[in-house]
Amino acid sequence: PTTIGDFIKAIGDGTFAKEIDDIRKTEDKGARGNKKRELLPAVMISGLQGGKDSSGFLHSGVLQMDFDEVKDLEKCKSLLMSDSYVCCAFISPSGTGVKALVPIDGGFHKECFERARNHFKGSYELIADESPKNPESLCYFSHDPDIYVSERSASVVQWGGGGVDAFSDSTAENLDTAVTITTSIDYITPKQGNSL
């Protein structure tokens, strides 16, 4: 396992800059995808396999949102950076999309995904990829020296069970710790990723 904080740090400090540069120079989308799986490790942003719940999955309380094939990357990232629900945003490994991390109530992952997807579509006309609806979906490392990490995000814990958007200072303060320090997530090496 690794932490979301380590994942974010690696994206910002260029741990995989060489591999990302190689991937982004590849014009064919299929070949780019193959290189990504071949060269990069991946994580499950939303938690750990073999966790404490009945399904064997321990949720991190963080949802990954993917916005692929974006026409204007900087505008998309800027919109996400201005959104009070987003705690982190960065350019995807392909260089053609933007990823955002959103704190949620992990007990209602799919419901939170639906609410988040509708929020981003309704607010910014951004169409989210469906893959992260599955809490075990993979997120590959990327490189973005200008990765955005919120100092304070609104909590969307209530996007799940209660169905009400809630902005709570206490959960917003906890978010900084959960996202940058303590949340453990599964880490898949490139070799393991090829077998998935």
Q: What spans do the regions from the language model cover?
A:
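DNA replication initiation modules
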Residues: P1, K9, Q49-K71, I104-L196
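Signature for HUH/AEP ssDNA processing cores
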Residues: P1-T96, P103-C112
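Short Gly/Ser/Thr- and Asp/Glu-enriched loop/turn motifs at secondary-structure junctions
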Residues: I91-V98, K133-L138
